[in-house]
């Protein structure tokens, strides 16, 4: 959603009006994001996601403020329902492998949960990895708690960075951590 949070903008770097683009709705992929060129190639309307680091650079299709919408679950009920797991906090980066549907994200720390209670054990840092489809299919609860922080960035290689916001609700999901 390019119109929400600190990293928002009115027009993308192709001159397209910024908008809220719903990518997944009720578990179904309903849209992607595009800049003007990729939209032309796909035969779709651009979504206002053509962004570049500076006027010296080419625009690329880039994420904006990307997050899950809030759900209905109470965080306390989600924690109580966990036999063994971790509440991960302060995610600070992630990357995807679009060819193989892989994903990797990092959180500053995780608080261990055993039989629905925090044990006091902290692990840090936490790297989550897996297959996007498996992760999305494993989501069993989405909290009503919702927070978006405008301190992120989206990179394309070592020189192409644009500001984004991240965050959202808590998700109860199965992921591989290490």
Task: Enumerate the predicted regions with their spans.
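N-terminal small-residue-enriched
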Residues: 1-178
């Amino acid at each position: 959603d390019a119109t929400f949070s600190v990293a928002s903008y009115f027009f993308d770097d192709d001159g397209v009006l910024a908008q809220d683009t719903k990518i997944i709705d009720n578990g179904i992929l309903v849209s992607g994001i595009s800049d003007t060129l990729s939209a032309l190639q796909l035969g779709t309307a651009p979504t206002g996601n053509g962004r570049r680091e500076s006027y010296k650079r080419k625009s690329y299709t880039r994420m904006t403020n990307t997050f899950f919408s809030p759900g209905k679950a109470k965080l306390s009920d989600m924690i109580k329902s966990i036999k063994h797991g971790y509440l991960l906090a302060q995610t600070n980066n992630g990357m995807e492998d679009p060819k193989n549907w892989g994903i990797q994200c990092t959180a500053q720390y995780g608080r261990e949960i055993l039989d629905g209670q925090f044990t006091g054990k902290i692990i840090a840092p936490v790297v989550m990895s897996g297959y996007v489809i498996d992760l999305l299919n494993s989501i069993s609860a989405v909290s009503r708690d919702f927070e978006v922080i405008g301190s992120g960035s989206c990179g394309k290689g070592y020189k192409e960075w644009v500001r984004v916001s991240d965050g959202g609700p808590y998700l109860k999901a199965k992921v591989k951590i290490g």
